[in-house]
């Protein structure tokens, strides 16, 4: 169980998180959604311990992350997997070496055992043919899948996904989602998935959390989010302009076509 | 600060005060960075192959530029030294003059400045890009220390490479001085090298050696710190690289003056 309690964080006097709280039960994947620039990635980096909160606490099975000594934090992190927005593959290493890296550094497996596991993981993500390629030679989707293979190679208990499908075409987005879903079923990790792919992500997550103005405004199942009375949440998941802005625009002399305002996307 | 008069007075004062505060803050961060690097340097395991890789990059990769600059520095010293000494009829002392200039001052300083320009800037850019593309965060998430993997190998490689490069610079410089002084201007090899061994002793070699070790540490410290703390995007990395080269070069010259005046 991951419990994030009343997280506050400011950067250069600008408060990004203003008391965000969330609970993730064992085996659940929570989709963290919300407008861009609201601090979803910042929230995720706090959960992973990459950022320290100004105030608030993060608990893993009752252990306070902020109170851990460095050695304890290192031990805890070995149970983590993190899929970064741009993959964060080591660009001086091949795909194979990238995926093998955590095993080489954190386990005592022989090179033969490492090879077996890496090839199996690359097979799972559909990159068996790309083991000798460097990150610069990969397409966006391949880089994401390679990064996913690296994140999953040590069978983490907790997976954090930071916009794993940003900038990819719909077919690749679908395949990445299927991959996350299948690995979740295979490994049973708990996780938080930051995403803008609405409503696609609702198909495989157990909960949805909506981060708005520095706080988690809504938490519920995918079904519950469609039924919520909260207009801000509703407008967001339907891709509408915020209700307040919409009301304002309805009062101006000329009629604003909402679809036009969004670039013609229905 | 609602009062306009107060704003007019306090804003410039605050701006002036912010400069030393930022400066002191940066010094503190650099100090903590060095302390962490030293901690991981002595806390096993050492990433031996990464150290070798960095020695290859910083040391072996800089040999060409060191040989070139060393040769031309020695040749210029040969010319200048010969014409200066010929005015007082002491061209026999060309060997000691070239050797002492190179061993004690020019060798360590110029070799360090060359390494700063070639390798220090590259180290900063590499770390800055790794920081921007979250590769450093990825290491931390895996429970691995970026200091152990990235900073310590660069420190050790720089500490090993810079004195060796300085030695190469000195040897090539002395030969360059002989090429001009001996071959072109007529000082005999016996005089050039004989007088050199009479006046330049082990203490001079050691003085330059200690300096080059200090400079090696300085280059690694500044380059790694600037890369590790680089700002966002291409602009952040380019600014970090420029700052690393400028700060390293200035610190090398200041450190050279201090070492010369207090230690030797």
Whereabouts are the PLM-identified features?
Chain A
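Helix-to-loop junction immediately C-terminal to a conserved catalytic motif
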Residues: 48
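Conserved ABC ATPase "signature" region
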Residues: 63-64, 111-129
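Conserved ABC transporter NBD signature motif
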Residues: 56-64
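A short, surface-exposed alpha-helical micro-motif characterized by mixed small hydrophobic
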Residues: 201-203
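Catalytic Walker B motif of ABC-type/P-loop ATPase nucleotide-binding domains
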Residues: 159-162
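Conserved signature/switch motifs of ABC ATPase nucleotide-binding domains
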Residues: 133-136, 154
């Amino acid at each position: 169980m991951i419990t994030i309690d009343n997280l506050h964080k400011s950067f250069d006097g600008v408060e990004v998180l203003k008391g965000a709280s969330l609970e993730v039960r064992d085996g659940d994947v929570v989709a963290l959604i919300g407008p861009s620039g609201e601090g979803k990635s910042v929230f995720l980096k706090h959960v992973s311990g990459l950022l320290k909160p100004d105030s608030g606490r993060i608990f893993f099975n009752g252990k306070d992350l902020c109170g851990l000594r460095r050695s304890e934090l290192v031990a805890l992190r070995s149970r983590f997997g993190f899929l970064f927005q741009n993959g964060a593959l080591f660009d001086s290493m091949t795909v194979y070496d990238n995926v093998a890296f955590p095993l080489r550094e954190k386990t005592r497996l022989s090179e033969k055992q490492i090879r077996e596991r890496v090839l199996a993981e690359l097979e799972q993500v559909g990159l068996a043919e790309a083991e000798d390629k460097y990150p610069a030679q990969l397409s966006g989707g391949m880089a994401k899948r390679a990064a996913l293979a690296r994140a999953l190679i040590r069978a983490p208990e907790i997976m954090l996904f930071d916009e794993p499908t940003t900038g990819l075409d719909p077919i690749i987005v679908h395949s990445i989602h299927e991959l996350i879903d299948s690995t979740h079923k295979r490994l049973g990790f708990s996780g938080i998935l930051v995403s803008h792919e609405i409503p696609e992500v609702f198909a495989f997550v157990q909960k949805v959390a909506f981060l708005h103005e520095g706080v988690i405004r809504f938490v519920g199942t995918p079904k519950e989010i469609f039924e919520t009375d909260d207009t801000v949440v509703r407008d967001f998941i339907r891709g509408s302009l915020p209700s307040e802005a919409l009301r304002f625009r309805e009062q101006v002399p000329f009629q604003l076509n909402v679809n036009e305002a969004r670039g013609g996307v229905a | 600060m609602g009062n306009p008069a107060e704003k007019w007075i306090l804003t410039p004062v605050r701006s002036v005060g912010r400069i030393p505060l930022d400066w002191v803050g940066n010094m503190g961060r650099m100090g903590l960075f060095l302390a962490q690097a030293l901690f991981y340097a002595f806390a096993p395991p050492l990433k031996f192959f990464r150290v070798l890789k960095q020695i290859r990059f910083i040391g072996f990769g800089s040999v060409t530029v060191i040989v070139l600059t060393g040769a031309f520095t020695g040749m210029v010293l040969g010319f200048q030294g010969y014409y200066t000494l010929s005015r007082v009829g002491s061209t026999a002392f060309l060997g000691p003059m070239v050797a002492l200039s190179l061993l004690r001052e020019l060798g360590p300083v110029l070799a360090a400045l060359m390494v700063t320009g070639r390798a220090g800037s590259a180290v900063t850019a590499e770390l800055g890009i790794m920081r921007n593309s979250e590769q450093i965060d990825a290491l931390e998430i895996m429970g691995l220390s970026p200091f152990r993997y990235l900073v310590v190998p660069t420190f050790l490689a720089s500490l090993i490479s810079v004195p060796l490069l300085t030695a190469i610079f000195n040897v090539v410089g002395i030969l360059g001085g002989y090429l001009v002084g001996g071959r072109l201007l007529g000082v005999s090899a016996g005089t050039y090298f004989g007088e050199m061994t009479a006046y330049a002793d082990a203490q001079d070699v050691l003085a330059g050696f200690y300096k080059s070790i200090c400079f090696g540490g300085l280059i690694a410290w500044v380059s790694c710190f600037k890369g590790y703390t680089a700002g966002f995007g291409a602009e952040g990395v380019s600014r970090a690289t420029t700052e690393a080269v400028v700060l390293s070069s200035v610190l090398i010259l200041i450190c050279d003056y201090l070492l010369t005046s207090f230690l030797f």
